[in-house]
């Protein structure tokens, strides 16, 4: 059993070695460790989903639950269900929810996202978000550590699994929000359409204006009519190499808390 320790005088909870709190701002924090943490893509996806206030929301493959916590920081949905298959990540997420005193707003479910029938109400959700593994099995080196392997490669679920799961959960007109690598764009669009989700809104993400896009954000609507809108490119940095104005807005109080 890992040793427990207090993270500071007056803190209400106890955490394990190797874990720390990322303070997102507005009184919301998320517990992370070396395996289960989050990056810029997660923050961009959480913002791309907004507004979520008053909605029934699901985060598939939630990991440490950063998307769910960012939603709570910005504009709380009516309820969030965070689905995650890995025991260690689920334990982290449950303690994060408890630390933030959000048990009434967030349900953490340890389940395989491919087997949610009977575990969650089908056709009842307003939105589903997922930051899926980007690499197919056989593409690149597979990490020996299980947690990192599941996060990076499609060993526990494929993009087709994610889209089918979301389609089952969503009500008619509900949306699935994804982020993915540009080289997988055709796979993602095809998987959405095969699941009955019509791609409606896309945004490319570039590090700087002169750099090629490596990431894209995509919204697919259940039962939506064909017609995809490509939004302006999201630039991470401006011409000086500093965060762009939009990135400063998206990071918001989170970045200020880290500095």
Describe each model-derived feature in a short phrase.
Residues 15-56, 62-64, 69-74, 219:
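SAM-dependent Rossmann-like transferase core, predominantly class I methyltransferases
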Residues 212-259:
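SAM/dcSAM-binding transferase cores
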Residues 38, 156-207, 211-213:
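Conserved Class I SAM-dependent methyltransferase catalytic core
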Residues 2-17:
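N-terminal auxiliary segments of SAM/dcSAM-dependent transferases
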